[in-house]
Amino acid sequence: MEKGTDRMAAAAPAPPAAASQCRSPRCTAERRGVRRELDSWRHRLMHCVGFESILEGLYGPRLRRDLSLFEDCEPEELTDWSMDEKCSFCNLHKETVSDRASVIGSSQSTPTEELSSQGQSNTDKIECQAENYLNALFRKKDLPQNCDPNIPLVAQELMKKMIRQFAIEYISKSSKIQENRNGSSFEPSLICKSIQMNQTENSLQEEQDSPLDLTVNRTQEQNTQQGDGVLDLSTKKSARLEEPKYDPLCSENSVSGRLHRHREDYVERSAEFADGLLSKALKDIQSGALDINKAGILYGIPQKTLLLHLEALPAGKPAPFKNKTRDFNDSYSFKDSKETCAVLQKVALWARAQAERTEKSKLSLLETSELKFPTASSYLHQLTLQRMVTQFKEKSENLQYETTNPTVQLKIPQLRISSVSKPQSDTAGLLDVMYHVSKTSSVLEGSALQKLKNILPKQNKIECSGPVTHSSVDSYFLHGDLSPLCLNAKNGTVDGTSENTEDSLDRKDNKQPRKKRGRYRQYDHEIMEEAIAMVMSGKMSVSKAQGIYGVPHSTLEYKVKERSGTLKTPPKKKLRLPDTGLFNMTDSGTGSCKTSSKPV
């Protein structure tokens, strides 16, 4: 039995002494990460729990009592410390005073005794002004001049001396700059004014929560008036407008010379600005829509350039970069209204003559069974006249509002045309009424124009109950319910297909601008042309032109690619059939109407 058990124990696998580590790279990386975390927590634990708490846990609460013994070891007053004669920082104050005295002595031609006394008095003045400056500075910020009691007294004294020394250096250097600029001796009034200016500058910087700036600003200008001595603290952007205040002697020469230089610089840099941007910015400034600052920021043009252009315009100088087509349109639209009325009266007389000629040709139309296109052309002439009236009205409205909003067209419900026509005025009368209405009411003008355009709306086939007589045809023509294109005198019927034929011909020959449906179509075509020209010339990118001109990005990009010939799929050209193939004149003998041939 013992031998059997020994064999079984030998056959059984021995338990592993220690788990072998996996050598895959993933497990190795995880082990390194865990080890790194443990190492980092050793350092984090001191900051999270506190070093004193860790020591207290290790050594007990007795250690903390022992550490508290060293809290009151700092002496309150310094008795054994004195200024070192060889310290460069401590002697800096004396060197500055001596340098100041030598500078004042060299600037004046007085004896040495007077120089020393005057230098000493000036030094005292500078120190007094520095004290006042620091007091005003601390009082403005509501900060105590005494330092934190936790800071050692040696460090407190050093900080106070350093701040005081910086203030003295700052005031002395600012007075040097004023002496060099004015060419005169050291004046206390100028020092006081410079101190006031420095206080205002530092208070502005402190209000912005920025550190105290003690650097010397060498390009600082004296903003005081010479007449009454009132300090001007206004911060204006344009130095050209401020120059006559503080330099009255040479102001005229300097301003004229600077303007001349600006004009020369403008002529040299004129090619950098866009064709339409400058004209548009000037137009917005003159209309009051934008300020000069806002226009300069929006269009990217310097304010000096805009000011020069605004000054050049009333002087009679032609402003460059004006769009020629826009100038032509503006001059054309600003003509006298009497001239426009005379042109419209001539057009109305011409339309009345065309209407009389159309009425005379009605009887000949009934006698001959063929369709004559002069009547259709007169009908299109009438529509053209109404379009001219609306264009004149739109131009006058655009001058007042200067907007590119699409004109609102009223939709008139389509009525079925019965065989009995409604009593209406003749075409010439309607034309004169439309001319007078276009002056008074825009709503009536829109409705009447829509009625004239849609004289025959789309409808089902209508057949007359009896043969068409001369009187019925005259009534159709006079009341404007049917167009001459819709009559077939052979069988005496009015068909819907002929009506569709007339409608398609009207749409092809006299296309009206379709209603703008979405945001992507609400843009001015002139502005779009300017944007396309700027992008194609390389002066702007598509995104910048979109932001400045306010045109759709996709439309602008498509039009630029279309004109440059870089479209991947160029648009297909529409096939136009000749005029002879527009209508197939067929007569089946059963009263069928004309059929329009559809383009392939």
UniProtKB/Swiss-Prot annotation:
DNA-binding region: 542-562
GO molecular function terms listed in the Swiss-Prot or TrEMBL record: DNA binding
PROSITE patterns hit by this protein: HTH_PSQ
Record's compositionally biased regions (Polar residues): 104-122, 583-600
Region (Disordered): 1-24, 102-122, 495-519, 581-600
Residue ranges of every copy of the HTH psq-type domain listed in the record: 514-566
GO BP field: regulation of transcription by RNA polymerase II
Entry's localization field: Nucleus
Keywords associated with the record: Activator, DNA-binding, Nucleus, Transcription, Transcription regulation
Gene Ontology CC entries for this record: nucleus
InterPro entries given in the database record: Homeodomain-like_sf, HTH_Psq
Pfam families recorded: HTH_psq
Entry function: May act as transcription activator that binds DNA elements with the sequence 5'-CCCTATCGATCGATCTCTACCT-3'.
Entry-linked PANTHER family: LIGAND-DEPENDENT NUCLEAR RECEPTOR COREPRESSOR-LIKE PROTEIN (PTHR21545:SF10), TRANSCRIPTION FACTOR MLR1/2 (PTHR21545)
Protein name per the record: Ligand-dependent nuclear receptor corepressor-like protein
Lineage: Eukaryota, Metazoa, Chordata, Craniata, Vertebrata
